[in-house]
């Protein structure tokens, strides 16, 4: 099996392992050297806040003193283990790293059909609540260690919503590849996704939506090899992405609706009128 829990059998070099019920309760440790210190990699599952799915979680644990904790919120059409090199590097330098596959991604998706689909999700709220559940699971064990959230691309949008809801639980955040969309374009995209889902269903994968979302990304390059050249200037990185069955799949209409939901949420303007008297001692001088 490529999709589903059986992918855990592809693990190489584990020192200790336990596999039960098709890996649903699978836990393994993999010890690595290189760079600064030893790293132990642990894989486990947590129940999603949607009450249906199991979140696939990976923990990179430094075997020396833990200086900080970094939680990864990965991007669209990828999975948290794609950050293995970064996570291992950070762990070798004293930072514990943890992250989960979002709903509809990686090992959290139960089948190929579920890739790009967010089952029982209340928009992006469920994805963010899942991130917070991972935070609580590790914060309970290490309450005094500085904690940071790293979000990339779509994961940065989720991280920004996380900051608006659970920001007090963090010591800092790193937003990579984040951005925004013009309100008119976002409104048109939401209307299109909603209309298509009424006709074709939530699981439908639409070429039109894909062109609306990514069609312009390659236009800045004079010559391109693939439709994903915009991902990286390194051709090998692009090829690795294209060859990975957990990457580059087409989002469902449901998936796009969740994506547009989080963009709408984080871009909602806050209208603030600040009033201060000329004699107010706290006013700026």
What does each of the following model-derived ranges do?
Residues 119-139:
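Alpha/beta-hydrolase active-site loop
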Residues 276-285:
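Single conserved hydrophobic/aromatic residue that forms the stacking wall/gate
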Residues 159-246:
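Alpha/beta-hydrolase-fold enzymes
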Residues 87-112:
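Conserved alpha/beta-hydrolase
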Residues 77-85, 97:
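Serine-hydrolase catalytic-loop signature spanning alpha/beta hydrolases and amidase-signature enzymes
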Residues 38-62:
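N-terminal cap/lid segment of alpha/beta-hydrolase-fold proteins
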């Amino acid at each position: 099996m490529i999709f589903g829990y059986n992918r855990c059998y592809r693990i190489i070099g584990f020192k200790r392992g336990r596999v039960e019920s098709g890996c649903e309760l699978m836990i393994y440790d993999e010890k690595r050297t290189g760079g600064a210190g030893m790293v132990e990699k642990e894989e486990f599952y947590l129940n999603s806040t949607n009450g249906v799915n199991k979140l696939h979680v990976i923990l990179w644990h430094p075997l020396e003193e833990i200086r900080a904790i970094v939680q990864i919120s990965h991007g669209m059409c990828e999975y948290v283990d794609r950050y293995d090199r970064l996570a291992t590097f950070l762990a070798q330098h004293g930072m514990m790293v943890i992250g989960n596959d979002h709903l509809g991604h990686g090992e959290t998706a139960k089948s190929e059909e579920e890739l790009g689909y967010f089952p029982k999700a209340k928009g992006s709220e469920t994805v963010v609540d899942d991130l917070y559940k991972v935070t609580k699971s590790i914060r309970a064990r290490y309450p005094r260690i500085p904690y940071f959230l790293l979000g990339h691309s779509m994961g940065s949008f989720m991280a920004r919503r996380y900051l608006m809801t659970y920001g007090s639980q963090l010591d800092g955040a790193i937003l990579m590849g984040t951005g925004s969309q013009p309100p008119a374009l976002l409104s048109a995209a939401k209307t299109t996704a909603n209309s298509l889902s009424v006709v074709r269903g939530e699981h439908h994968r639409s070429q039109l939506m894909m062109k609306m979302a990514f069609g312009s990304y390659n236009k800045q390059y004079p010559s391109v090899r693939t439709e994903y050249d915009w991902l990286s200037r390194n051709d090998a990185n692009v090829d690795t992405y294209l060859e990975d069955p957990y990457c580059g799949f087409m989002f469902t209409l449901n998936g796009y609706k969740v994506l547009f939901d989080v963009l709408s949420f984080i871009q909602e303007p806050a209208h603030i009128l600040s009033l201060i008297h000329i004699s107010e001692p706290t006013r700026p001088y």
